[in-house]
Swiss-Prot record:
Lineage: Bacteria, Pseudomonadati, Thermodesulfobacteriota, Desulfuromonadia, Geobacterales
Protein name: UDP-N-acetylglucosamine--N-acetylmuramyl-(pentapeptide) pyrophosphoryl-undecaprenol N-acetylglucosamine transferase
Pathway(s) annotated for this protein in UniProt: Cell wall biogenesis; peptidoglycan biosynthesis
Bilayer disposition of the protein: Peripheral membrane protein
Compartment(s) where it occurs, according to its Swiss-Prot or TrEMBL record: Cell inner membrane
NCBIfam families registered for this protein in UniProt: murG
InterPro entries xref list: GlcNAc_MurG, Glyco_trans_28_C, GlycoTrans_28_N
Gene: murG
SUPFAM superfamilies with a match to the protein in the record: UDP-Glycosyltransferase/glycogen phosphorylase (SSF53756)
GO molecular function annotation: UDP-N-acetyl-D-glucosamine:N-acetylmuramoyl-L-alanyl-D-glutamyl-meso-2,6-diaminopimelyl-D-alanyl-D-alanine-diphosphoundecaprenol 4-beta-N-acetylglucosaminlytransferase activity; undecaprenyldiphospho-muramoylpentapeptide beta-N-acetylglucosaminyltransferase activity
GO cellular component terms given for this protein: plasma membrane
Length: 371
């Protein structure tokens, strides 16, 4: 069987696609996967290094653009649709899966026009406009959070969770805490870092003076901010490992007592799988404010706490950190609730559902020929 996985742009869209690809390829040595993305997305840099096949098309968003840019974007979408039809003809997939991002729409639309089985995966609690539209023309919709269910046709929507990279699932080992031990904090703002989160941590340090000796911080800053953040920790005398990018996230999660992070869908999936208590700082400019809605989904279940960026100060962040340090039972309860929300078999569920749909279609064709 052949599968096209379309989308990307950010790690939040791409990493679930990689998890699905790995599961699909593991099912049969004859299976093939082709990713389709854009040259500006993270997929163009990452997928060739990981050994996956990748085709590039022209696509961009329209939201928030002026009239001229919207016209240009529409032109790119039409060209991307033409490119998508060519890719479908050459690769001849049995299945197409859109995982979000600019490349998702042209491929799924082209698949509909050519009669190819097509699906989408929605990572967030609140879907964007593209997936809301595509949800009406696909054979199946896979959602990560129950809040998204109301936006799609009930008869084709399945709650699967958000697929997690195998290196996170297989490599995670939680450290054993002991009384009087150090307190380890993992800080990251997504695959590219987040300058506002970085600054908030540095601003919080003077308010953590009484516990500085206990703190051990691992901080993913993004490439542009690493030097500034490293100097900030050194000036405050806090032991911190500052990295532009963390390659081994499973080890980083395993060592952490607390995570300070954004609230993208992939982050949510990973921290729940690892059962981590989190202080979420949602990115305020995410489409349709979906990061805030993602975080609220966990906060309402006592599986995390949230500080909106508009309310973010070093003092407020320090107060949250101190509160969780001083109340380990509350942190442990948060971890338990987060772990209960994890869906570790998301990739398997998605692949199984797509394969079953395809088999049903093949049987229908055979029955029609038999008549």
């Amino acid at each position: 069987m052949r599968l096209i996985i379309a989308g990307g742009g950010t790690g939040g869209h791409l990493f679930p696609g990689i998890a699905i690809a790995d599961e699909f390829l593991a099912r049969s040595p004859e299976n093939e996967v082709l990713f389709v993305g854009t040259e500006r997305g993270i997929e163009a840099r990452l997928l060739p290094k990981l050994g996956y096949k990748l085709a590039l098309i022209s696509a961009s968003g329209m939201k928030g653009m002026g009239t001229i840019k919207k016209i240009m974007s529409a032109g790119r979408l039409l060209y991307g649709y033409s490119q998508s039809r060519k890719i479908l003809k050459e690769f001849r997939p049995d299945l197409v899966l859109g995982v979000g991002g600019y490349a998702s729409a042209p491929i799924v639309l082209a698949a509909r026009g050519m009669g190819v089985r097509r699906f989408i995966h929605e990572q967030n609690a609140f879907p964007g406009l593209t997936n809301k539209v595509l949800g009406r023309i696909v054979d199946g919709v896979f959602i990560s959070m129950p809040e998204a269910e109301s936006f799609f046709p009930k008869e084709i929507t399945q709650m699967t969770g958000n697929p997690i990279r195998k290196e996170i699932l297989w490599g995670f080992q939680e450290r054993v805490r002991s009384v009087g031990d150090t307190f380890s904090i993992l800080v990251f703002g997504g695959s590219a870092g987040a300058q506002r989160v970085n600054s908030a941590l540095l601003e919080a340090l003077p308010h953590l003076e009484g516990v500085k000796g206990k703190l051990r911080i691992t901080h993913q800053t993004g490439e542009k901010d690493a030097a500034r953040v490293r100097e900030g920790y050194q000036a405050q005398g806090v032991q911190a490992q500052v990295l532009s990018f963390i390659d081994d996230m499973s080890a980083a999660y395993g060592a952490a007592d607390l995570v300070v992070c954004r609230a993208g869908a992939t982050t949510i999936a990973e921290v729940t799988a690892c059962g981590k208590g989190c202080i979420f700082i949602p990115f305020p400019y995410a489409a349709d404010d979906h990061q805030r809605k993602n975080a609220e989904s966990l906060v309402h279940k006592n599986a995390g706490v949230m500080i909106l960026e508009e309310d973010l100060t070093g003092e407020r962040l320090a107060a949250k950190i101190l509160d969780l340090m001083e109340h380990p039972a509350e942190l442990a309860e948060m971890e338990k609730n987060a772990r209960a929300l994890a869906q570790l078999d998301a990739a398997q569920a998605i692949v199984a559902a797509m394969v079953t749909k395809n088999q049903e279609r093949d049987k229908d064709k055979e029955n029609q020929r038999a008549r």
